[in-house]
Amino acid sequence: MTGGGLMQLVAYGAQDVYLTGNPQITFFKVVYRRHTNFAMESIENPFNGAPNFGKKVTCTIQRNGDLIHRMYLQATLPQVALQSTDGSGAQFRWLNWIGHNLINYVEIEIGGQRIDKHYGDWMHIWNELTQEAGKQAGYAKMVGNVPELTNLLYQGGSNCDNDCYGGEPLTSEVITSCAPMYTLYIPLQFWFCRNPGLALPLIALQYHEVRINLEFDSLNNLCWDYSNGSSDAHAIRNRVGQCGLAAASLYVDYIYLDTDERRKFAQVSHEYLIDVLQFTGGESITSSANKLKLNFNHPCKELVWVVQRDSYVSCDDSIINPWKGQQPFNYSDWWDRSVLESGYSVTRVEGMAGKNPVVTALLQLNGHDRFQVRDGNYFNLVQPYQHHTNIPAVGINVYSFALQPEQHQPSGTCNLSRIDNTTLLLTVSNNAVGTNLSSTVRVYATNYNVLRIMSGINFVLNACAAFMYGFALANHLCSRASCPANKQGQTV
């Protein structure tokens, strides 16, 4: 008996010409493309000096392969155990999202010139906007947002799990007196880390070293403790500080090319369209109405801003002790009580009590309104819904000039180099700037630039750098015919 599907096949009319007339593809014959031969390997690169809390370190990227792609900071936190001398009421916990919080800043430098600089705060915001739902729980484990680190330690609690002994592992509900040694894997988010087509060609940078400079945050911004066993209320933290980081290094994914492609990469010039971060520092505010001048340049994909109460990152024990530590990634206008109610190990913070401190926002370009005044939730909810993978936590605000700002392919920009005055007008809630309250506004911009890598063959390095950095293709910073001595290109 003939199947009913044939009825669909013969029901063909003039309207179908727009869909199936002169077909260009078939769904029933797979087509693939052959690729060049290559191999990948992740290799550990050590830091120069001893990495530790509050220290600045540098990693000179080893020339183990032809290109570099992904990078991960691997850092091991020391084991923390309460001692009887800490007192009966002693407590300790690592702060949430310790992996992001650990990084004060990280920057990439090529030939002595800084190309891009990221911050732990930005890495957390970027994760909130872009992380796929299926990876969020695993990513939280990678960066240490787990109960065994963020739950409070109490005197008389259970000891840490020991892998050398059998038995059922401790659950998050079990009270412990010990936080285990824990290795963090924090992925860096530079342009070449996110797209293999932008992998940085070490083989073409024959005369320039690539360095990663990183500053770890100080320990008092990473944990909370209380000790009533001595005159030192921070005896536990000081003991952890003496131990320091157990280990820290950089894991780099190297790409090895086959002979022909390797020769081509080494001999020809390269020009990469890259996206980098701009941040000019936080601005303190104490009033509800604020007018912020944005000193950004280059074609900008989007603006991202947060307003954070200064009390959330205070070092005053009388302020943070009721909340068991600082809340560096709380961008709402009230303390996050959900961390208390959930045992400190929430992987996201939608349940917080506070609201978006941005009541309204307006962007002006040379005195002209870019849009009408909008409610803060438009930037916290609608804009991320339109342009990003995730709708972020409360208080992360976005305005995108691009259709798809997460993608490398340009899909819209605003050239802020051609705008004399870019101004962000914010109305902020009284919970953020009320009586005796102050907050800090941080505005980030992602923009395009061009990285030029010139072949070292027949090249006078003293007269012209082997790589050039600047956006305008028409305004060449370097040419073989004319090259000002020692000109190193534009600074970000």
Where do the language-model regions lie?
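Short, low-complexity Pro/Thr/Gly
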Residues: 1-492
